[in-house]
Design a protein with these regions (language model features):
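Short conserved segment of the HATPase_c
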Residues: 176-188
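Conserved HAMP-HisKA connector
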Residues: 2-25
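Short beta-strand/loop element within the Bergerat-fold HATPase_c
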Residues: 151-163
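Conserved catalytic submotifs in the C-terminal HATPase_c
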Residues: 98, 109, 114-124
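A conserved beta-strand-to-alpha-helix junction within the catalytic ATP-binding
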Residues: 89-101
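Detector for a conserved hydrophobic position within an alpha-helical segment of the HATPase_c
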Residues: 206-207
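Histidine phosphotransfer helical core of two-component systems
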Residues: 30-68, 88
């Protein structure tokens, strides 16, 4: 079984390498197109009263928008295809959640979203690649923001779970139908205009790389709940209260 798993890992690594190389090759001509569109936009802006220039400028702006969309897609794809070698460190989950919420708070305020947090005080430490996990959590928060275009509430809750810890994100947004739920974590699936469909797929990939799981419950018109569960290695349990790794045993 281990040989089969290693072959699968090797095959995935090679596919990811080729995909990344292809994406980088696309980026180079895309950068040239974007630069020339900027130069054309400057030229056509010289005479705003000229109807021919105005029409040309509008067309240039459309091309610029599509170039930006392709750039976003490439960036998201490179992040999704990346072979992740996690730098796992003992981490206080509540501290990490607070940091990401602090970064997200201005966006929530702009969207009239109230964040309510219930962070359990007695959580054991978990092993996280903090940068990767922050990216996954931010993807979920942005997804909740997009689900509440008219504002709402977002509850962020941590708690103990069987053999680990749980992180819940509960929004009062538009919710999802059964079809959307069944395809939610598929790469390139998106219900948003201009969306790449890679944010949630990448988030799940990161959570699963940590040995965790991500689940979702949703009701159309009522809201959505994402739940991340993460394992707690036995050697970290002894340091759960103080947030320290257990020291060496005394003779």
């Amino acid at each position: 079984v281990s040989d089969v798993n290693q072959r699968l890992v090797d095959q995935y690594t090679e596919i990811a390498r080729l995909a990344g190389a292809l994406a980088h090759e696309i980026k180079n001509p895309l950068s040239t197109i974007r630069l020339n569109m900027e130069l054309l936009a400057e030229d056509f802006s010289q005479d705003p009263e000229n109807p021919l220039y105005r029409r040309a400028l509008n067309k240039v702006k459309v091309v610029q928008q599509e170039c930006q969309r392709l750039q976003d897609l490439l960036d998201d794809f490179l992040n999704f295809a990346k072979v992740r070698r996690l730098n796992l460190e003992p981490t206080n989950l509540n501290h990490q959640v607070r940091q990401v919420l602090g970064f997200f708070q201005p966006k929530a305020k702009e969207s009239n979203i109230e964040i309510i947090d219930y962070l359990a005080s007695d959580l054991p430490m978990v092993l996280l690649d903090r940068k990767a996990f922050d990216g996954a959590l931010l993807n979920l928060l942005l997804n909740a923001q997009q689900a509440m275009p008219n504002g709402g509430q977002l509850v962020v809750r941590t708690s103990g779970a069987r053999d680990g810890v749980a992180l819940d994100l509960i929004d009062t947004g538009c919710g999802m139908d059964a079809h959307t739920l069944s395809h939610l974590f598929e790469a390139f699936f998106s219900t948003k205009r201009g969306g790449t469909g890679l944010g949630l797929a990448t988030a799940r990939k990161i959570v699963e790389a940590h040995g965790g799981q991500i689940r979702v419950q949703s009701e159309l018109g009522r809201g959505t709940q994402f739940t991340i569960t993460l394992p707690v290695p036995a050697q970290l349990t002894a340091g759960a209260v103080t947030g320290q790794l257990p020291g060496p045993s005394q003779p």
